[in-house]
Amino acid sequence: MAKEKFERTKPHVNIGTIGHIDHGKTTLTAAITKHAALRGFGKFVAFDEIDKAPEERERGITISTAHVEYETAKRHYAHVDCPGHADYIKNMITGAAQMDGAILVVSADDGPMPQTREHILLARQVGVPSIVVFLNKCDMVDDEELIELVEMELQELLTKYEFPGDDTPIVRGSALKALEADTSDDPAAEPILKLLDVLDEYVKEPVRDTDKDFLMPIEDVFSISGRGTVVTGRIDRGIIKTGEEVELVGIRDTTKTICTGVEMFRKLLDEGRAGDNVGLLLRGTKRDAVERGQVVAKPGTITPHTKFKAEIYCLSKEEGGRHTPFFSGYRPQFFFRTTDVTGVLSLPEGVEMIMPGDNAAITAELIAPIAMEKELRFAIREGGRTVGAGVIGEIIE
């Protein structure tokens, strides 16, 4: 049997299940793959296969994540599901699995629980653009009014964290009953098919990396006699064409220059695109005026800052993190893109310390400015060893 070729004819969207433990995230994931497969879109992945998700390491942090894929008539979805609550937190903070949208699974007989709230907050902090709700275990609740109360509570909770609560689609069903249904005509399967339609309609297609504003973190700087200064790195997003104006942002004062050449594997190109490892020739720029840790970007699209708020996860001792807690005034290095910058970290009022394995909202101030924006990921390091991971929630100055 020949291996089937991945046809990229449909738009691709990354999705994930979030929500409180035992509310049915993994059962729902299995049910979706089953009914997508019954319609000829992808293959069924059983509950047990998803539940024993392999461990992955992302920036030194161990995360268990299950990846499944399925299609609808309109789209191809890559879907992540995490077995444990801690895995979700790590996943969202490190950006190991970027989500264009999330399915919030809430059990109708429990209603919103602490992790429901925490996952919504995290989704807001790390920039998940949209959430749809699957109200699970509706077969266990006889009282229509109770279900409506849970829905109202969810709408309020979503609105509180700046999602459009009143416009958020809520699909009622039972993931287990759907998983047990063997045909798509079975009434129990209907909510799953409806959920897939809702994903198609409500979750927006992501902007492709090549359509975003150009940005490349500088990894290295060379001086080529007779040609000038070349900076190398992997283009993070956007497209750079020869002759375009760029800005050098971070660490020093922002300067403008012209990119006079794009090279890849020693060949000259007309343009470099997101994902390419390239060398950019910069007009009139001295070798010592640029350094690793700066970014080359489309002018006016990113600014340097030193002070920000972030959501961080502190590695546990088992993950190779610290053995002891840290307090306000802690001075680690913050690793942004390609470089470490020392900074001082402050904890929110009422939080005395952060223990290894905890996550927390913090404020940090760096000793040198870095090109930054909301949702930028970073690592927290001590002498080259990663002790935490974070994502910027808000820029202060």
Curated annotation (Swiss-Prot):
Signal peptide interval: none
Region (G2): 60-64
Span list, region G1: 19-26
Location of the region described as G5 in the Swiss-Prot/TrEMBL record: 174-176
Entry keyword annotation includes DNA damage: no
Region named G4: 136-139
Keyword DNA-binding appears in the UniProt entry: no
Domain tr-type G: 10-207
Sequence segments annotated as region (G3): 81-84
Binding locations of GTP: 19-26, 81-85, 136-139
Chief location of this protein within or outside the cell: cytoplasm
Annotated catalysed reactions: GTP + H2O = GDP + phosphate + H(+)
Positions of Mg(2+) binding: 26
Keywords assigned by UniProt, alphabetized: Cytoplasm, Elongation factor, GTP-binding, Hydrolase, Magnesium, Metal-binding, Nucleotide-binding, Protein biosynthesis
Any one GO MF annotation of this record: GTP binding
UniProt xrefs under InterPro entries: EF-Tu_GTP-bd, EF-Tu_GTPase, EFTu-like_2, EFTU_2, G_TR_CS, P-loop_NTPase, Small_GTP-bd, T_Tr_GTP-bd_dom
Pfam families documented for this protein: GTP_EFTU, GTP_EFTU_D2, GTP_EFTU_D3
HAMAP family tied to this protein: EF_Tu_B
Subunit details: Monomer.
Family statement: Belongs to the TRAFAC class translation factor GTPase superfamily. Classic translation factor GTPase family. EF-Tu/EF-1A subfamily.
Protein name in the entry: Elongation factor Tu
Organism annotation: Desulforapulum autotrophicum (strain ATCC 43914 / DSM 3382 / VKM B-1955 / HRM2) (Desulfobacterium autotrophicum)
Organism taxonomic ancestry: Bacteria, Pseudomonadati, Thermodesulfobacteriota, Desulfobacteria, Desulfobacterales
